[in-house]
């Protein structure tokens, strides 16, 4: 039996989400239609509202409902520090630590030549203009520690250093509460190389 085209379209739309395969998308679609029509309508309205009202901040490129986001407008922040992250979700995680009080630039991705993502796609020119405004003194590269994140950090670091900016990278090592026997060898090696005096 062929499913209705409206249901097929819903399944395909849900499959576009990261980590959602065909079976999960189908289960979600059937659940929404069978058991939670109100939730489905609320989800649809929320998605529509978000797509109509969210835009990119003119300064840092994160999501905002205004031209400039609250972080960029916050005069209590250190305007000489610029932290570069891959996604708005990464920015939120850093904010939750309450340890960083500078400004941000959100790349909305990372370099991945095999996927056709180059400097243009991660808004590299905008980042360089922002970092070269004469106020920024240090750029903190907080890209993820994946191969693509490392390549992105290396590329950005080389380019920004050539413009006379101080560039730092997030430290990495054993997670808080982590036991060495459960931590991978690469992480332990990095923690050993980046050790500090006490």
Curated annotation (Swiss-Prot):
Q: Name one GO molecular function term.
A: DNA binding
Show where the Toprim domain sits: 80-175
Zinc fingers classed as C4-type: ranges: 57-72
For biological process, the GO terms are: DNA recombination; DNA repair
Q: Which Gene3D superfamilies match?
A: 3.40.1360.10, 6.10.250.240, RecR Domain 1
Keyword set includes Lyase: no
Query: Is-annotated flag, keyword Metal-binding?
Result: yes
Protein name listed in UniProt: Recombination protein RecR
Q: Which organism is it from?
A: Paraburkholderia phytofirmans (strain DSM 17436 / LMG 22146 / PsJN) (Burkholderia phytofirmans)
């Amino acid at each position: 039996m062929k499913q209705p085209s409206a249901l097929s379209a819903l399944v395909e739309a849900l499959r576009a989400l990261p980590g959602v395969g065909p079976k999960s998308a189908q289960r979600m679609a059937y659940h929404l239609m069978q058991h939670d029509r109100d939730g489905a309508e609320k989800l649809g309205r929320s998605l529509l509202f978000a797509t109509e009202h969210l835009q990119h901040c003119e300064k840092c490129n994160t999501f905002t409902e205004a031209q400039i986001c609250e972080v960029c407008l916050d005069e209590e922040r250190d305007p000489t520090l610029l932290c570069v992250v891959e996604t708005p979700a990464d920015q939120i995680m850093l904010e939750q630590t309450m340890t960083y009080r500078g400004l941000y630039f959100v790349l909305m991705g990372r370099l991945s030549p095999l996927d056709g993502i180059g400097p243009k796609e991660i808004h590299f020119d905008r980042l360089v203009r922002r970092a070269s405004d004469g106020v920024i003194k240090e750029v903190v590269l907080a890209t993820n520690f994946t191969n693509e994140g490392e390549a992105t950090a290396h590329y950005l670091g080389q380019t920004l250093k050539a413009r006379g900016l101080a560039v730092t990278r997030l430290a990495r090592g054993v997670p808080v509460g982590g036991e060495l026997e459960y931590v991978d060898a690469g992480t332990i090696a990095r923690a050993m190389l980046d050790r500090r005096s006490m």
